[in-house]
């Protein structure tokens, strides 16, 4: 009986607490985030952060995902996400990965991407900012991911196997 009383009291307390929340209220904006919109329509968000010191994170989100694909295109957004790491206009082949790993950004842990039903996201985390040119290079990579993924035939053939293996292991 004591457990039942405690359970009812806890449920009542939670219900009362939840009743105080208005789900329609907007989440307050972080006053330290600078936002803006470029002429090309891209919205940006910049926030200064001291931790970890001497490092920055870069993310770019594209409103492209599986929901835009028809039956003949299933998996295309995910495939393109993979291809972004196989060369761009300014960093052909594996130059992007080689450069970022040379400055301390590890592929997989700090350099990655993901595709969902409505979005594809690319990220570089813990990019060192102390050496001149690294921030410019990171911004160039974001630019290339948005406009200039190389899509070389040999890289497409190579990545096809990677995607097929990923699908095989996901299904098991």
Task: List PLM regions with ranges.
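Active-site-adjacent, His/Asp/Glu-enriched structural segments that form or flank metal-binding
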Residues: 52, 62-77, 81-172
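Mature N-terminal segment immediately following signal peptide/propeptide cleavage
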Residues: 22, 26-61
């Amino acid at each position: 009986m004591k457990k039942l009383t405690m359970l009812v009291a806890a449920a009542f307390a939670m219900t009362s607490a939840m009743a105080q929340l208005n789900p329609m209220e907007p989440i307050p904006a972080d006053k330290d985030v600078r936002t803006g919109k470029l002429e090309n329509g891209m919205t940006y968000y910049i926030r200064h952060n001291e931790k970890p010191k001497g490092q920055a994170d870069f993310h770019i989100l594209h409103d492209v995902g599986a929901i835009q694909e028809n039956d003949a295109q299933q998996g295309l957004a995910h495939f393109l996400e993979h291809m972004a790491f196989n060369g761009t206009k300014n960093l052909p082949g594996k130059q992007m990965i080689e450069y970022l790993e040379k400055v301390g950004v590890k592929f997989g842990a700090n350099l990655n991407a993901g595709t969902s039903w409505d979005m594809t996201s690319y990220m570089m985390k813990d990019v060192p900012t102390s050496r001149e040119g690294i921030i410019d290079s990171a911004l160039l990579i974001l630019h290339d991911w948005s406009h200039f993924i190389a899509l070389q035939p040999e890289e497409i053939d190579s990545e096809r196997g990677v995607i097929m293996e990923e699908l095989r292991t996901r299904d098991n």
